[in-house]
Amino acid sequence: MLRASSRAPPRVRACVATRARHPPRLARGRSARATTHEDVFVDALVHALGAPALDRDDDEELDAYVARALAGRAVVVSRVACIVAECAGLPEATAAVATAKTPTREARAELARARGVASALFNACMSAYNRLKDWESCQTLVRLMEDDAGCAPDAVSFSLAASAMARAARDGEAHAFLLEAESVLKRGTRRNKKKKKVRVDDDMWLKVLYETDDVAAVHKPAGMLTHSSEGAGKSPSLSDVALAQFGELSDLNGSDKRGIVSRLDKPTSGVVILAKNNKAHAELVTQFYQRAVTKTYWALVDGEVPLGAGGTIIEPVDGRPAKSDWEVVETFVGDRWKYALVRVNPRTGRKHQIRVHMASVGCPLTGDTLYRRGRAKTLNVNAPKCVLDSLSGGKTGTTFFLHAGETMFDVAGKRVRVNEPLPVEFSDLLDKLHAASSKASS
């Protein structure tokens, strides 16, 4: 077992205690819990290494910082794992549940929280070793995470370790490790007995934007689920169609999410990357985790914002730090309505991030009711007919205009750029808004 709190290295105990008494001042919009634990871990690691403190700017991810801290230093991996557990509060939380005759709900919740924090820190350390091309330390951390810390490795954990092996040309080890990952991850998956087999016809085939033996980039139409576990329905999901179309896809993320590395909301259209095998899946997950994948979205939003307005939004999503760059590229103004076309580049990949962030600056996505608050509810209540017609195809709040127009990622060491123009419905609506706006201003 990892050492209990009382046996942790004195520098680690002192650092954790100091940080608990004097938490750091947080940048606007950052998650207090996530930032505090990250800062505690960073301080504890640097102190334990006996290394000078390294400057870290707001744009540097935790794993990149840890890689810089570990670079050139001989550090026993189990020591890093001990620091992770200590900073997450895992020894105390585990002991509180293990020693209690009947653990309280609060104690169990605290253990679950500590395991969640520890898992996130473990993954950051694995990504750091991945950056350092140290596949053996990645593998060891997965073992320590599972056997000693009591944290279940997830698809990200296995992907970071497997891609480190593949990048080091240890294909045999990577293959064996991914086979083990399939078995471990399937044990924690509850089978969906209600899922019915859906029929996929040839006319449903996805538009292929890019393809190799290992990956494919396809166009997801608006209104299609990315994978079947997102909700019930008789219509095939993108994963269903892709499996029928390509014949074989990765299953590292579960049998109901075959090939899916990153999802898009049902109303969102655009580029989706698929992994055809688990080795490619692990590499793509690593690229997403290390922010090597860049995406550009186009969104139609409500509100009056000047042309060229924009900036960087730093606002947590579901308690996790999130950042997006945005810019207004066209405005549409009528007598009683105002819209804007914005370009958004998410720097992180949280669920509903763009929807949350645009609503946070007073420009919710046109048609999106979920994140509309306060005065935003009164925006464009007298919408033009072209907008009303475009939103009339489904229930209120289930249609909005968001398109993943460009994705860049690496394949075999080369940078790949995949573009997909706006869908006809989106483009036609912009043309009609432009015409109506020009008429109103004349």
Task: List the predicted regions and their residue ranges.
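RNA pseudouridine synthases
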Residues: 7, 21, 25-28, 33, ...
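Hydrophobic packing position at a conserved site in alpha-helical tandem repeat units
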Residues: 69, 73, 80-94, 100-114, ...
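Pentatricopeptide repeat
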Residues: 38, 62-63, 118-123, 127, ...
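N-terminal chloroplast transit peptides
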Residues: 1-20
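Hydrophobic anchor position in alpha-helical repeat solenoids
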Residues: 44-45, 65-70, 80-84, 99, ...
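Pseudouridine synthase
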Residues: 235-242, 278, 289, 336-409, ...
